[in-house]
Amino acid sequence: MTDNNLTIDRFLTPFVVAHQAGKPIVTVLRIDRLDRILRRCIEEQESRVQCVDCRAIYLIEKAFNPVNPFATSMSVDRLIYALGEFVHSPWLQDDVEMQAEQWRFVRAIVDTVERTPGFEERHMTPQLERQITMLRDHVRWGLHRTSQARGRR
């Protein structure tokens, strides 16, 4: 996670703005903890002691809450669909470097979910597979555009 140099508090604004505009996406709570949560997920996955139904995914889910503030977690598929809504909302910052970081942020979450032992066997459906493919295509496109924009500066 540190390779991507993610500064998580920078991502608070687009989520909050989208939520306040009434967009049907999740609000990210405790986002300052998200990079620690993702790092811990990766560490736990690498130790191979956690399955997808256990702590690794739960830690990601805890960072995201549906509009209902009393909900404590969401399912893996709901997390992926929420990310899909997020990338289709006007969430990108004007700054090219910031855009690249935001795309890497989305990619980091998808990577973390997919690398979790047991994810594919227990949770993958044709719809979810299409959603993940769409997210990966969006990330590829977004990073390509930011790379081109950097070259024009």
Regions found by a protein language model. Give the residues of each.
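Charge-rich, intrinsically disordered N-terminal extensions
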Residues: 1-92, 99-119, 135-153
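Short, glycine/acidic-rich hinge or "gate" loops at secondary-structure transitions
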Residues: 120-126
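Short, highly charged C-terminal tails/helix-capping segments
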Residues: 126-134
